[in-house]
């Protein structure tokens, strides 16, 4: 084609590209508010789902195999006569030991727990239900306190309690303490071991301390301006718990670990061991021995494998013997193991126990050492004993149930009572300080007359001196004096009381320890006087070394039996004080001047109504001796002696005798009865 090249066949001419029009702002759709709100929610949901997947893939301890929800009653809080802070119960959260205070009994919770290797609490609620009113019982305040280390001994005070998780309880009102699983988590990914013998520190777990502060008073017993102590129940404590268990491993012996409270005042002696000087606890309390005696006989040397925890009221009396370890008794918590061999093996009524401050020390046998000399007897009003370590988890040596024939009844085993030496006697329930005994009951006096009690013995003595200070008692008849020295006599261990005057026929009525037990157990105190009674004020120098008598203490004015003068000032008289807190019987004597010489014979004192003249007749020191024919009358001289007819011959004889023989015996007895009747009519 002329004038230019021809275009390729089939080619399309280029056309300009048309630009797409963007939608205008009016045409663009705005997202709704609902869509905007859903976007962050979906993002958060995806984030949570991712976290859940990560947590599922992570291993947090063993898997939960079983759970149990139940309610357990763990005990009661009772009123107290002491004025300090006292621990009455320490309850472990270990399900084997969370039980009512009834010794080695099983509970549904302990049975379930003994079947597994590990436990952890999912939820815990502690309820205190009041058992007394708030209008008539006053003076005390209760505490529920959480202790993360249940096997730790510490000297607690109200300030240290309030620094921990606690609930303060006013009398007569219900309270609740709720705990979460996080607060009670164990050391093994939140789990605790069940068997306390494997690793007690990893098994015992946290504990709740049930405490009471200050003395409890009963306003209904108010008389003459003074109130009486209340020692009844204040609260019942129960725990509503949910437990998780893991790793099935049944151990039947763990079902019956002991957890029991003992009341009534248990006396123990703290002293250095004669073998190595370590501190040991000695007791002859039958209740304590029954709990702490090993179940399996055979061990003769060393120390028992079973470890016991003792939680009780705070005791200050033994601090001098314990030395730097005095906080154990002040805190009211320590651990013991029975000592075999030596004097403990020779004496079946008294046992010795090694004292430890912690379970780790008990497991490795690391005892404590206090002062090298000295012995101190202390009385724990309330103590709670727990079996911490039982070496045999398969058996607790309890008698197995039987399905065969009923066993033959066994006669009761005789119980050996401690009668000698007298210093070992600790008290007998129901016996007042002064009494007449008719063979079956004890009758206290109804007045406060003097010349009714004699006190003798070989007391421990010391003379203390100091700056001029007030000493004595002031009431309507007696007045205080200024003193620079005091003679102090301790009759606790070796004092003996005799009745005199109208009580002369009673003979020996008390030892020092049994008298203290009688006064502190709520018996009629006559002729003893309350130290805080209305109109009476006590003065005791600070250098005397003993507290000023007060609430719960009792006293008597006493004089030498050779002194029949009337004293109205606190000079040349004995003030015999029975201290409730320390359980000691102390006599204070003020000579008013020079030191008193050592006695050349045993002291012998008689009681005088404080500030009054001695009661007449004065004490006598012998009674009338009866002749033999007055003591034992010959049976032949008594016409009615045949009244005592024994039927033993008619019921105990040869089982092969005939019936005729029994009939003849019966006729013979009837004939003797008729003869006796005729003889009475003739008389």
UniProtKB/Swiss-Prot annotation:
What does its PTM field state? Specific enzymatic cleavages by the host yield mature proteins.
User: Bias category Pro residues: which stretches?
Assistant: 398-413
Compositional bias, Low complexity, is annotated for 1-13
Coiled coil, from the record? none
- Subcellular location, in the record's words? Virion
Which spans does this entry mark as compositional bias, Basic residues?
14-39
Q: Specify the domain of life of the species encoding this protein.
A: Viruses
Keyword Hydrolase found: no
Q: Chief subcellular site? A: virion
Q: Name one GO biological process term.
A: symbiont-mediated suppression of host complement activation
**Entry's Gene Ontology cellular component terms:** T=1 icosahedral viral capsid
Keyword hit for Transmembrane: no
Instruction: State the UniProt keywords alphabetically.
Output: Capsid protein, Host-virus interaction, Inhibition of host complement factors by virus, T=1 icosahedral capsid protein, Viral immunoevasion, Virion
Region feature Disordered, mapped onto this chain: 1-45, 391-413
UniProt xrefs under InterPro entries: Astro_capsid_N, Viral_coat
Belongs to which family? Belongs to the astroviridae capsid polyprotein family.
**Protein's job:** Self-assembles to form an icosahedral T=3 immature capsid.
- Specify the protein name: Capsid polyprotein VP90
Source organism of the structure: Avian nephritis virus 1 (ANV-1)
